[in-house]
Amino acid sequence: MWAPGHHHLCLIFLLTCVFACVFFLLIHQNLFHSGLDLFLPCPDRSRVRSPVAILCLSGTLMNPNATFTCPRHSASVSGTWTIDPKGRFGNQMGQYATLLALAQLNGRQAFIQPSMHAVLAPVFRITLPVLAPEVDRHAPWQELELHDWMSEEYAHLKEPWLKLTGFPCSWTFFHHLRDQIRSEFTLHEHLRQEAQRSLSGLRFPRTGGRPSTFVGVHVRRGDYLQVMPLHWKGVVGDRAYLQQAMDWFRARHKAPIFVVTSNGMKWCRENIDTSRGDVIFAGDGQEGAPNKDFALLTQCNHTIMTIGTFGFWAAYLAGGDTIYLANFTLPDSSFLKIFKPEAAFLPEWVGINADLSPLQ
């Protein structure tokens, strides 16, 4: 039997290397010059159970709330912004709207924290994706505390990883996106229908007639009874203010009915004049579960608010005429350093001055 010598083995090895190189070059040329891109697939959408953000391994952010496929060409991530959720229902609505508006203005992707999602998602059809906790823990965040009015500097923020803080709720941040904000804060259908059924079932207590104009009334009390006079040199809406506000509507609208909600319903029943037979105490006063009261207010035609973000958002979403409590602090109150009335209340809303005599 013929056995190859040493020089034959060397020749065979060299020829094998040459053929391997030629084969590799042909494959390489075919892959990268024939228009075929290599990419990594997104996760199976059927396994996405909650509105969390999905990042394709190519680095492209995908929206799980819409039908999608991963792009074949990688795109640079535009940045990740979020906001630290603080306060209760109305506060977090303001934080959500401000985050959405500022992120869009600066070309960034907005994410909300899981705790904010837990507060707002049971009530509204919100669409912003939820930030995964592990991303929140390890991201190289830079923080920015917002004051409660829009400033030019907020339109030119360069940080790609930005966590906003504070209690923004000024219309100056988001009013140019009003239709989008109203869409984000669309009630779930079962809440809207329940509120509509409640309103359609209301009758004037004396005559039994059906009202045609509904005025939502939100009376903020609770912790504000101590916070306003002791900390901010301010007052809350009193009996006289509510009487003036109701009379304003009675003078301009035929046979309105006033739908009262509050976190102090006992006070409302004892202090709001019901002698005309046009007041309904509809609120349940449950601060921990504001869904019913808020839905009722937003389905009304007009709004009377006292102070606070809950009343602001009820009025903003309801539309129509709005009466608010104006000048509710003394001129030297430190509250005016963080609160600008012209940035808090829409220009077309009507203010009625508060009675500050209890502070004198």
From Swiss-Prot:
One GO cellular component, as annotated? Golgi cisterna membrane
Question: Where is this gene product found?
Answer: Golgi apparatus, Golgi stack membrane
Q: Mind listing the UniProt keywords for this protein, alphabetically? A: Glycoprotein, Glycosyltransferase, Golgi apparatus, Lipid metabolism, Membrane, Signal-anchor, Transferase, Transmembrane, Transmembrane helix
Major place of residence: Golgi
Reactions listed under catalytic activity: a ganglioside GM1 + GDP-beta-L-fucose = a ganglioside Fuc-GM1 + GDP + H(+); a beta-D-galactosyl-(1->4)-N-acetyl-beta-D-glucosaminyl derivative + GDP-beta-L-fucose = an alpha-L-Fuc-(1->2)-beta-D-Gal-(1->4)-beta-D-GlcNAc derivative + GDP + H(+); a ganglioside GA1 + GDP-beta-L-fucose = a ganglioside Fuc-GA1 + GDP + H(+); a beta-D-Gal-(1->3)-beta-D-GlcNAc-(1->3)-beta-D-Gal-(1->4)-beta-D-Glc-(1<->1')-Cer(d18:1(4E)) + GDP-beta-L-fucose = alpha-L-fucosyl-(1->2)- beta-D-galactosyl-(1->3)-N-acetyl-beta-D-glucosaminyl-(1->3)-beta-D-galactosyl-(1->4)-beta-D-glucosyl-(1<->1')-N-acylsphing-4-enine + GDP + H(+)
**Keyword Lipid metabolism, does the record have it?**
yes
EC number(s) per entry: 2.4.1.69, 2.4.1.344
The glycosylation sites annotated in the UniProt record are N65, N301, N327
User: Entry's InterPro entries?
Assistant: Glyco_trans_11 (IPR002516)
Cite the GO molecular-function annotations of the record: alpha-(1,2)-fucosyltransferase activity; galactoside 2-alpha-L-fucosyltransferase activity
Q: Topologically, how does it sit relative to the membrane?
A: Single-pass type II membrane protein
Protein's pathway: Protein modification; protein glycosylation
An individual GO BP term: fucosylation
Tissue distribution is: Expressed in brain, intestine and kidney.
One Pfam match, given by its short name, reads Glyco_transf_11
Glycosyltransferase found in the keyword field: yes
Q: Which ranges make up the Lumenal topological domains here?
A: 28-360
Highest taxon listed in the record's lineage: Eukaryota
Q: Which residues cross the membrane?
A: 9-27
Q: Which residues lie on this side of the membrane: Cytoplasmic?
A: 1-8
| Matching PANTHER family | GALACTOSIDE 2-L-FUCOSYLTRANSFERASE, GALACTOSIDE ALPHA-(1,2)-FUCOSYLTRANSFERASE 1
Record's function text: Catalyzes the transfer of L-fucose, from a guanosine diphosphate-beta-L-fucose, to the terminal galactose residue of glycoconjugates through an alpha(1,2) linkage leading to H antigen synthesis that is an intermediate substrate in the synthesis of ABO blood group antigens. H antigen is essential for maturation of the glomerular layer of the main olfactory bulb, in cell migration and early cell-cell contacts during tumor associated angiogenesis. Preferentially fucosylates soluble lactose and to a lesser extent, fucosylates glycolipids gangliosides GA1 and GM1a.
Family named by the database record? Belongs to the glycosyltransferase 11 family.
- The protein depicted here goes by the name Galactoside alpha-(1,2)-fucosyltransferase 1
